[in-house]
Every structure is written in C-alpha cells, then in structure tokens.
Amino acid sequence: MMKVLVVVALLVTLISYSSSEGIDDLEADELLSLMANEQTRKECIPKHHECTSNKHGRCRGNFFKYKCQCTTVVTQDGEQTERCFCGTPPHHKAAELVVGFGKKIFG
C-alpha cells in the first residue's frame, strides 16, 4: 500500500511539473504576442496624419479602425497627385456618438 502511495505521489508531481512548464510556455507566447501588438500600435498611423504611402497601417479609434481617405490634389504646375489622410468616416462618427450617448444614459 505504501509503494502505491509513493508511485501516485511521484506521478502527481511529474504531471503538475509538466503542466506548469506548459503554462509557462503559454504565458511566454502570450507575452511575445502582446509585445508584437504593442509594437504595431506604436507604428500605426494616427488620426489626421498622412497615409498615402501606407494605406493599411491605420490606428484604431474608440470603436473602429480609422479609414484612409484620399483626395486628388492639383498643384500649381497642373500635376495631379493623390494625398491620403487617416480619419473617421461620418457613419463611424455617428455610431460612436450613439454609443457614447447610450453609455451616458444607461451608465
């Protein structure tokens, strides 16, 4: 009976040790993922900044990702160039206004 208890105790110890290593690996992976997300957040293009060369690197607003809004600019020489900036589209502004108003009313 004593040998069975010793073997069970060893098995429980081995299982808990191996699962704790797995959890540590999982936490390390999550930490690396969070660090990568933080890095991309720092590199994203903020609101009202130019996004002509990188139309997909926009930052997130309160609820939605900003849109890269482009216009054609005609220079004094008559050349047409496309200029883009990050901004919030009107329908996103309206949705944010409604959600903000709802939060104020319903807490």
Curated annotation (Swiss-Prot):
GO cellular component: extracellular region
Localization (cell): Secreted
Signal sequence range: 1-20
Propeptide feature ranges: 21-41
Superkingdom, taxonomy of origin: Eukaryota
Primary site of residence: secreted
UniProt KW Secreted keyword: yes
A UniProt-annotated Pfam family: Toxin_35
The UniProt record lists the keyword Protein biosynthesis: no
Tissues in which the protein is found: Expressed by the venom gland.
Family: Belongs to the neurotoxin 19 (CSTX) family. 04 (U1-Lctx) subfamily.
Name used for this protein in its record: U1-lycotoxin-Ls1h
Source organism of the structure: Lycosa singoriensis
